[in-house]
Amino acid sequence: MGGRGLPATLRGLPRPVWLLSAGTFVNRFGSFVLVFLVLYVKHLGYSTAASGLVASAYGVGTIVSALLGGWVADRLGRRGALALSMFSSAAAMLALSQARSLATIFAFSIVAGLTTELYRPASAALLADLVGPEQRVAAFGIWRFAINLGYAAGPIVGGLLAQRSFLLLFLGDAATSLAFGALALVALPKGVRVAAHLETRGEAVRAIARDRGFRLFLIASALGSFVYFQAQTTFALQTVAYGHSSVVYGTLLAVNGLAIVLLELPLISVTQRVPRVPVLATGLLLEGIGFGLIPLSGATVWLTVTVVVWTVGEMVFSPVAGAYVADLSPAHIRGRYSGAWGFSWGIGLVLAPSLGALLYSVGHTLVWLVCLGCGIVAAALVLASPKPSSSRAAAAGAGDQRPLV
C-alpha cells in the first residue's frame, strides 16, 4: 500500500468520486420510506405482524437487487444502471404510496427494495473504475461516509414529514431519487460497459466459482453481516432485558453513528497504508469481540464500550472490503463481483433477525457467543484466502487507467 496521507489522497480523488458521493448522500438522506415503512403500514390499519412482513418483503427486494444490479452495471454501464435504479425507484415509491391492500403493498415493497438498492453494485463498480488500487480505500470511505451521514440526518426530516402526512415521505423519497438519477445522467461517466457478444455465457459465474479467495471472502462477509445486524435485533432485546429503556437502546445506536462520522475518515488514513487482508480480518474479529462482550455486564457504560468495539470493527472492515473486491474483480465483470458481495451481505441480513432471535430464546448468552465465534471464523477465512498476485492486481486496475466518458 502507498504512503500518501489521507488529505493528499482525498485531494487526488477525481471529481466524479465526489459527485457520486454527493448524489448518494442526497438519495440516502431521502430514504424516508425505508425508515418509516413499518409505521406507515400500521397507520393504514394493519397489524404489527403484517408490518413486519412488508418490511421483510422490502428486504427480499434488496437481496435480489444485489445480483441483478451487478449484471445491469456490467451490461448498461455504471451510469445507465444508476439512472435506471433511481428513476425506477421514484416510480416504485409513488406506486407504493397509492397501494392499500396488503397484497399490493407487499408486492410494491419488493419492487421498491429491488429498485432502490439496484444502484449499489453500479456505484461500487464505478468507484473501482475511477481510481487505482492506491486510492480505493479512500474512495470507498468517502462514499460510505456519505451513505452513513445521509442515513443519520434523513430520519429527523422524515419524522417531521410523517407528522404532517405520510404521503410527503413518499414524495420526498421519490424527489431525492430523481435528483440523484439526473445527476448521474448529467455529471457521471459511463464507466466500463461490456457488450453481451463480447462475454461468453456464464463467464462471470465461472470466474467467481474459480476465485477461491473471493469465495472465502463472501462466506466471511455473510458471517460478519449476521453479527453486525444483531445490533438491530437481539441487541435491542438484550438492552431491555438488562432493565434499560428504548431511549437507552436508541442512544447506544447513536454512539455507533456518531463514531462513524467522527472517526471513520481518520481511521482510513491508517488502513489505506496496510495490506488489505489483515485489515479485513481485524475488522471482522473486532465485530465478533464487540458483540461477544455484551453478556459480561448490563451497565450502560459497558454496553457503550461494546458498541465502540464493534463500530471500530465496522469502520475498519467496510471501506477496505470495497477496495478488496475491486482489486479482485476483472473490470468487465466488476459489477457482478460487487453484486455477489452485496448478496452475501444480504444473506446475513436475512438470517440475523430469525436465527438471532432463536439463539437468544435458547439462552441470552448463546447468541453473543455465536457472534464471537462467527467473528473468529470470518477472520480466519479471510486470512486463509490466497493473496492476489501482482499481475492480477495490475489487470484489475488496468480498466481504471483509460478515460471514462
What name fits each language-model region?
Residues 108-149:
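Cytoplasmic helix-loop-helix junction between adjacent transmembrane helices
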Residues 65-77, 263-276, 360:
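Helix-to-loop junctions at the C-terminal end of transmembrane segments
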Residues 80-94, 278-293:
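Structural signature of the two symmetry-related core transmembrane helices
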Residues 10-59, 214-254:
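Helix-loop boundary and gating motifs at the non-cytosolic
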Residues 1-14, 189-219, 400-405:
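Juxtamembrane intracellular "pre-TM" segments in multi-pass secondary transporters
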Residues 64-100:
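Conserved MFS/SLC helix-loop-helix module at the cytosolic interface between two early adjacent transmembrane helices
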Residues 176-194, 381-386:
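C-terminal membrane-cytosol helix-exit motif in multi-pass small-molecule transporters
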Residues 32, 59-63, 67, 151-152, ...:
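Residue-level signature of mid-helix packing/kink "hotspots" within the transmembrane helices
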